């Protein structure tokens, strides 16, 4: 058992991997902070964050404050006597009083190559930007939004099949590796590198309306949205006054001469849609009220799909 006392703060799936890696290395997790349970699903039943479920399974103490700005909540955290706090997609702002608690500071695993893509959804931003490389930064958290100095970074190529969950899983593991390497150097931590604020970019929260297709944009951009916004909010258009979700797509350059939003049934079982540049081939899709299916299966039930305009 490593004697270093760690408080872990994280909420979604992304945070599971570094927490598991800390536990596997025998670190003493003296407390796990995660977001409060939220209503989810059609029944709106309270659902715990993924990190809470893992923490309880491992017998760890779980804390779910609505905010860490209250002195009484800060006193509880201080009472855990953490040497270091590790943050991975926690979702709450940490005031300066919290940042000052651990002797070795607050370490944050941020899934982008900082200062690029500061903000809440850097993985989606990486895919939307069409970047060739994705990455993760291990930084010292400070009061600004992802502005703290960086201890280490690692980059990986973005694959054509990467979606936000797939890419996030890979970055979570790499971030965990960076974290373990840095923790092994305590108490002799290296000097972190200041970020170049002049090169900083930001990307905020993803909202549902971002999933609405604008057929006046290039097919390559729409396809990136399909991968970036999977599984939520998804990418969608309309057909026959029903929502049509695009689950998987591929940009093409076939020179079919289609107008933006115009459908062409190609080679009998493929769906091409015109855009501002090139065609978007829809590979998997889901019509409102129906199950998700391949383009070929969809066309078997929609014999008049050729030539229609989507989103009108």
From Swiss-Prot:
It catalyses: L-methionyl-tRNA(fMet) + (6R)-10-formyltetrahydrofolate = N-formyl-L-methionyl-tRNA(fMet) + (6S)-5,6,7,8-tetrahydrofolate + H(+). It comes from Dehalococcoides mccartyi (strain ATCC BAA-2266 / KCTC 15142 / 195) (Dehalococcoides ethenogenes (strain 195)). This is Methionyl-tRNA formyltransferase. Coiled coil: none annotated. (6S)-5,6,7,8-tetrahydrofolate binds at residues 112-115. The gene is fmt. Attaches a formyl group to the free amino group of methionyl-tRNA(fMet). The formyl group appears to play a dual role in the initiator identity of N-formylmethionyl-tRNA by promoting its recognition by IF2 and preventing the misappropriation of this tRNA by the elongation apparatus. GO terms for molecular function: methionyl-tRNA formyltransferase activity. It comes from the Bacteria. Gene3D superfamilies: 3.40.50.12230. It is an enzyme of class 2 (transferase). HAMAP family: Formyl_trans. Belongs to the Fmt family. CDD domains: FMT_core_Met-tRNA-FMT_N, Met_tRNA_FMT_C. Transmembrane segments: none annotated. InterPro entries: Fmt, Formyl_trans_C, Formyl_transf_N, Formyl_transf_N_sf, Formyl_transferase-like_C_sf, Met-tRNA-FMT_C, Met-tRNA-FMT_N. One of its GO terms (cellular component) is cytosol. Keywords: Protein biosynthesis, Transferase.
